[in-house]
Amino acid sequence: MWFVMVPFLTHVLSSLKEFASFFSKTLAKRVPAGGRSTVEHHEYLCHVHSRSNGLVAVALCDREYPSRVAFTLLSKVTDDFLAAFPVESSWHSVRDDGSGSSHTPALSFPILDTVIEKYQDPAQADPIMKIQKDLDDTKVILHKTIDGVLERGVKLDSLVEKSNDLSLQSKMFYKQAKSQNSCCGMM
């Protein structure tokens, strides 16, 4: 079983790194070729993406990291890896721990660091999450604007009622216009 381990732990102690490596290898062996799986372990999720050619990518994330984005990351990493090493023999001969056999050097995959850095903020890396974040921000602004308009409407009602300068006919016109405009409110 061959895999690329993608740890999302920023300050990994050696013992934690060792455990993450063991946990990743164990899970990579248990996911069937072409399958995907997520396993929960304490405060972390371990996402596993296995390709039909035997290449497996694993991401260790906290619970807040969106699973869909994690699997998008794993798919991108495996695609980039296969683009960099298209011949299976170039990576099938590499041992599980990333070191080469006595005849094969370890594979260098510098793109991995760039991809991991990009995916640290899922809202920036994933277009769907970015759109959702923009929609949420717009919704908050819209709610504030509507609340402000409604608040101004209440103040205007109060001013009209208190005004001695407006005739009874002007007050009736204002109330009638307001009731007719209310049928056209936003839903």
Each model region followed by its residue ranges:
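Acidic, low-complexity cytosolic segments
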Residues: 1-157, 161-164, 168-187
